[in-house]
């Protein structure tokens, strides 16, 4: 008997919806990264994108533990001298709440060429609605403790 190796044509992509309302950011990001990589499937292959599409709702209502709301910062650099921009989570949540979830999930994806393909399958929305109803996504529960 030969070892089964998945091929790109053998992967059937499904759609999943995760509601982040009141759930800790790390728990949402961990579940999303697992689904995007395809680690929930029996045909998971590390060198192949076997993951599904993930839609995350209510990104503006995601929960942070401890004092992260005041202490955690996001850094961006333009590449020019003195081009470092630093923003606290409190400011990012008001200006662009989707970025909190996107950055957390992106950090949990592998640092390989496949990560861009996996990241493209992530859709994050600040509110409770999304335009992907035609794909018939299944709802995924994430522990909120």
Label each residue range with its predicted role.
Residues 109-131:
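C-terminal structural segments of small proteins and small subunits
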Residues 1-103, 113, 131-145:
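Ribosome large-subunit tunnel/peptidyl-transferase-proximal elements
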Residues 106:
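Acidic, metal-associated active-site segment
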């Amino acid at each position: 008997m030969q070892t089964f190796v998945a091929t790109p044509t053998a992967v059937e992509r499904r759609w999943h919806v995760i509601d982040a309302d009141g759930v800790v950011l790390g728990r949402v990001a961990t579940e999303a990264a697992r689904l995007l990589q395809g680690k929930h499937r029996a045909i998971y292959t590390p060198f192949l994108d076997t993951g599904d599409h993930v839609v995350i709702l209510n990104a503006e209502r995601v929960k942070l533990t401890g004092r992260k709301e005041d202490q955690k910062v996001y850094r961006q650099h333009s590449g020019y001298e003195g081009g470092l921009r630093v923003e606290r989570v409190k400011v990012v949540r008001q200006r662009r709440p989707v970025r909190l979830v996107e950055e957390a999930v992106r950090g949990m994806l592998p640092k390989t060429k496949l990560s861009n393909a996996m990241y493209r399958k992530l859709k994050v929305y600040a509110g409770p609605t999304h335009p992907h109803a035609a794909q018939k996504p299944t709802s995924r529960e994430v522990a909120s403790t």
